[in-house]
């Protein structure tokens, strides 16, 4: 069987969509479902389109790792150093040495704990209801509703946040986050299990409500994406039957991963710079408009 170049082109379009939307509050999964339906990418049997979307999401996550490598690597080192120093403090006679190491590595340890806490709620919910979420929530209808609901929530919560920020203290340093704030953000991340809601929108809204600045909430969203998406992707990749893969599938997979990675690199940098100057309202308005248009297309049976 020859290589299907049209299918590869469709796959690359989906990868570009993923890279453009993964880290902005518009729902990458919702857009991939919508665009995939429009270009008939989702019609291939055997579950390849779903597995492909999982792989290109990992490409997007790699972009976060590359851009924030210094913070990630130093935090991992400090996290492990804190654990070993704590053990040493309890078992060794040289307490002064280990107390010093504990103090030096406390920032990285707290950051690591915050990421773990923020990951737990969605991880539990995703594991418990993985099959039900895939079966009942992955459709254009639920995406349309998610677009609109998420857009309205973004407008309401951001307006409330900006009023509150004028009269109360806002956390502007990611290392100053409390465990309670990370838990609240993690609970909001559960909303992202609904395609169309957007993981970044959900966690940023949680950050606003918990008292984080927009930049801190967004950066914490990036870090939460690593364990959340690697875990979810690992489960899907483990269940996939690779015996059905052909040359077209493998080429699509490799190129899609690379394209999603490159596009995400650009988008993350631009998005952070945008947020330092302007509000999220434009994304919220786009979501509501896109949701209404999608609902009309579904109602008129232009798409299913």
Curated annotation (Swiss-Prot):
Keyword vocabulary terms for this entry: Antibiotic resistance, Cell membrane, Cell shape, Cell wall biogenesis/degradation, Hydrolase, Membrane, Peptidoglycan synthesis, Transmembrane, Transmembrane helix
Catalysis: reaction(s): di-trans,octa-cis-undecaprenyl diphosphate + H2O = di-trans,octa-cis-undecaprenyl phosphate + phosphate + H(+)
Chief place of localization: membrane
Superkingdom per UniProt: Bacteria
First-tier enzyme category under EC: hydrolase
One annotated GO molecular function: undecaprenyl-diphosphatase activity
Gene Ontology CC, one term: plasma membrane
GO biological process: cell wall organization; peptidoglycan biosynthetic process; regulation of cell shape; response to antibiotic
Membrane topology (UniProt): Multi-pass membrane protein
EC number: 3.6.1.27
Membrane-spanning ranges: 5-25, 47-67, 72-92, 111-131, 137-157, 209-231, 248-268, 283-303
Subcellular location: Cell membrane
Family, similarity comment: Belongs to the UppP family.
PANTHER family according to UniProt: UNDECAPRENYL-DIPHOSPHATASE (PTHR30622:SF3)
Other facts noted in the record for this chain: Bacitracin is thought to be involved in the inhibition of peptidoglycan synthesis by sequestering undecaprenyl diphosphate, thereby reducing the pool of lipid carrier available.
Function (record text): Catalyzes the dephosphorylation of undecaprenyl diphosphate (UPP). Confers resistance to bacitracin.
Protein name as catalogued: Undecaprenyl-diphosphatase
